[in-house]
Amino acid sequence: MIRVVSIVLALVWGEAVYAQAPAAPVVQPRVYANMLQLMRGTLYPQSNVIFTAQVEDPAAFKPAAHQSTSSDPFTSAYGGWEAVENSGMAMAETANLLLVPRQCSNGKPAPVQNADWKMWIDELREAAVGVYKAGQAKNDDVVLEAADKLATACLHCHAKYRNVPGGNVNRC
């Protein structure tokens, strides 16, 4: 009986100690770029891959003489349709970065907590996955559909947060 009571007390004490342990602090990633820099450095070049694939067959690009240093995704070591796939995944991952608190180019906080911002980031992520699937499909119709969804996702957010009256003062 004493043994059973000792075991029960040890378990209760262990639970009490575990329950009182402080939660590990949530660490926010360090931010280096404002929203404009993030967009221009990541989404702009990656979206141009799918927009180029609308008018030029990714498989028709000739590999660059120095593929490992080519700045053109289509002629690089990971060119052709793989460039379309990679741009889709890069944009989907970048969508996560658009939710990290940071500054707009005008110094104001980016609206990352706004419901519409979050909704449009989800739309961007979904469109980016569509770009990835278009690269896998290697099909012009799928590319056109993916490019349209991506352009629409960008337009929704840009209409409110980029192309605004008052210029840079009011934009993110």
Regions inferred by a protein language model and the residue ranges of each:
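Bacterial N-terminal signal peptides
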Residues: 3-16
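The canonical Cys-X-X-Cys-His
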Residues: 150-161
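Extracytoplasmic c-type cytochrome modules immediately beyond a signal peptide or single-pass transmembrane anchor
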Residues: 20-149, 163-172
